[in-house]
Amino acid sequence: MQAPFSFMRRAIILCLLVLSPALAAAATDRPNIILITLDTVRADRMGFLGSKLGLTPQLDALASQGVVFEHAYSQAPITPVSHATILTGTFPQFHGIRNFGDRLPPSVPFLPDILHAQGYHTGAFVGSIILDPKNGFASGFERGFDVYNAGFHRQKTGERREASMQRRGEVTLGYVLEWVGQQKGGPFFLWFHLWDAHDPYNPPEPFRSRFPNTPYNAGIAYVDSIVGNLLDYLRSQGLYNNTLIAVAADHGESLGDHGELTHSIFLYDSTIHVPLLLKLPGNRSAGQRVSATASLVDLAPTLIDSLGQTPPPAMQGRSLLPLIANPHPESRPSLATGDHSERSFGWSALVSLRLGNQLYVRAPKPELYDLASDPGAKTNLYTDKRAVAVRLAVQLDSFVKQISEGAPQSLQDGLDEKSREKLSALGYVASGKTSPSTRIDPKDRIDVANDMHDASLAIEEGREATVIPLLLHVVAKDPQVQAAQYYLGIAYSRNGKFGKAIPPLRKAVELRPDALMAQYELAICLYETGDLNTAATHFEILVENRPDWSDARYSMASIYARTGRPEEAAKNLLIVLQGEPDHYRANLLLGRMLFLNGTFDEALPYLEKAVAVQADSGEAHSFLADEYEKLGRAADAANERAEATRLKTSTR
């Protein structure tokens, strides 16, 4: 185990690298480095890894000019964790990113930071909000980047939340090409992330029509075409030859293998075996194939080693370049970790160790597979080969202990409520702080995980009524899954069944008192059923924990207004509007309160703002008409009244 990566050691190493005479002499010849990460792409869909589906002609051509690692493995089947491993060269046990919402500690070595300190221009261009540091995800990933282009936005009225959180590869590529074209007078490091193979699968034409029955495959074919467009541009600009291009998937997709529909739970080859290739400058070692085990944790050290430099001591991966030079390398172990089952469902986490053809999975029901004779990991040999399993278990425990030594304090702040909603829109069960773990084996609950995935998408798409029977089945099977109770409450609430929503929402709050969104929805349902005092108490708790949560504060204020506390209501509405001047309901309520109080001049700007913010609200136009009448503006009042009537008629 290498020593922790201290700030001072990093500074010394970087200074030595920058000041090295050999490096300085070759500075003008330093290659550009492009890292392309393909989200959710299985290894067995690559032509260069044996697929006959014809999905990846561009990647296959690139592979023929580079080095292919036939047995490359991810360290986690989930986007932020795997990308943290790729970019830091450390295992999740060290870098501390274990799930959504965790922050990357500043003391962990970071490839962009290292290259930037050596004079590289650095740019990141990502296809999903999952990797956007500014939206509650991937905090700390911006370190070392001159440009971090994510470009995601708050959901617009009438827009599906999913549409505000991801973008087509062609859109991201447009920003990439613009940035690359601006890089003059020095080498650049580009990280280009493509999200399009991720579910919900929504490939564009003509790929949708080419693969009508397999939208996942269509998404991969589209991603391949985008990679081809980038390569064509590099060639047209004379950049291709002196550019090192690394292509890797962060993880794969189960597609029903072992019962898992997508990814994030299991650690089998469907999600852990990933494509990995390197196109070296000058096409060195073109066409070479490496059969030895490689891991994504090895990628950052490899890129640094390719520059003739020694990776920082805290990087735990090992350069893959010796595997290219040595046709008979030693067998390398590969570790994978799955914490999502624990963080989101309260089940047991999974950890696996792969050594040669043997795969051991530490779980409540341990697993052992001989992948040489059983590549699909269908036959668990744990009982028949207990001695082998025990030996691998000891090695795994030793490995985990070693890579955990010197790890910085984990920064697990968790996600805010809006971020959890965004995750749900992408089909993830939104998770916050670690749930109390049980010894439930995820293998025994994978149907629950699948059902929860489907439920989250159904709710996002407005199909709440259809998903209620499914969620009732889930909570009957495992009532301790907090997200299932929450989704059931949401489904009832959005169908106007507020009374039925209250019990599952109460259970959700009981299971996770820190789950503020569950408490918010519970408060709304209590309000709708007339229990204003209890609802107010819940909103007060929310505002105390999240003072900037405008909707919670507005709801609290609206109860105050209804229960004879107008001063407190007005005070909190003003706080809402200080942070969010265009908050429609706060403007409307405050304006109406001031109007009813007879302070017409004070009411006017709030009512006019409400109409400006939501021009299709008949209620807002009607209230503004009342206001104009009191101010003696008869013509304006008539116009507003007419518009209110028109809107009311058009919605019938």
Which sequence ranges carry the predicted segments?
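Eukaryotic tandem repeat interaction scaffolds
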Residues: 550, 554-567, 571-592
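Sec-dependent N-terminal signal peptides
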Residues: 11-19
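Bacterial N-terminal signal peptides that target proteins for export
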Residues: 2-12
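Catalytic domains that recognize anionic headgroups
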Residues: 19-506, 510-531, 537, 548-558, ...
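TPR/TPR-like (Sel1-like) alpha-helical repeat modules
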Residues: 612, 618, 622, 626-650
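Tandem repeat domain/solenoid detector
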Residues: 500, 506-507, 531-533, 537-544, ...
